[in-house]
């Protein structure tokens, strides 16, 4: 390396050091402002997690970004800054389907940042219980997958527990095959969550026709089991599980269809309080008579409310009766829709607004 290029490199490093000092000073000023906000919130019941405000900050930064720093890098950096700001105001307990390493865990880590306390639960009902009892501030649950449909159990749990949707996230899902180093031909058993096995059945049958596919509670549990077993077993799940449990990634992107997305919900103990809430989810049951559902849908149509999802579920404990989960565009919690809500309640046996919240980006991101 020439003296000229060495000098230039040295000058650049001095410049970077100077910029880092400026960034550090600004980060501490931002932290002080966050603490001041937290002090104001401390005297009220205001929520720390503000999905609309965070979305507004991120979109504003991305729109102003000149482009030298890729927008996805900028978003990742600022999610951690925002996570730190929330932590300074008050530690947040966020529960998810464990153990560490599930897709819910990685979705929470990416969206809530590393400063949130991510706490694993054994099943979905434990998440709803923790949030409804105030044992956790927030919960992260998968609601539906683009290939395999709705997670019906979580729809049912919304009817049983007083929790509300705060935000939604769309994430691209990709699966890998993880082993302790054995060749695929030596694998006798493959463990994973039932949904993950369903999404990879074609690849597994084509490449491992003799292997038994065994469903377990989660993809992370599958990796955990493989780590503690012999070399004849494998797990299907997020490839980052290999780092957590000391496994080998034997094959990547083994899902049968590449366009695989999961919609996650962030749930809390009370409805979102402010900001742009451009999506609403409802859960209701109707009387057992002809046209009852049509009457409800006609009320929505008559108010120019666009419905983006309608799904029926068996009403728990009531033979041949159904409840309906609906997604709508708009904020049905707004004052302008008060009369519509009363009309809907009058036509339903049970009626619950699960939340009005900022619509997630359909483009999503890869976990």
Give the location of each predicted region.
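Domain-level signature for soluble enzymes in the chorismate/prephenate branch of the shikimate pathway
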Residues: 1-367
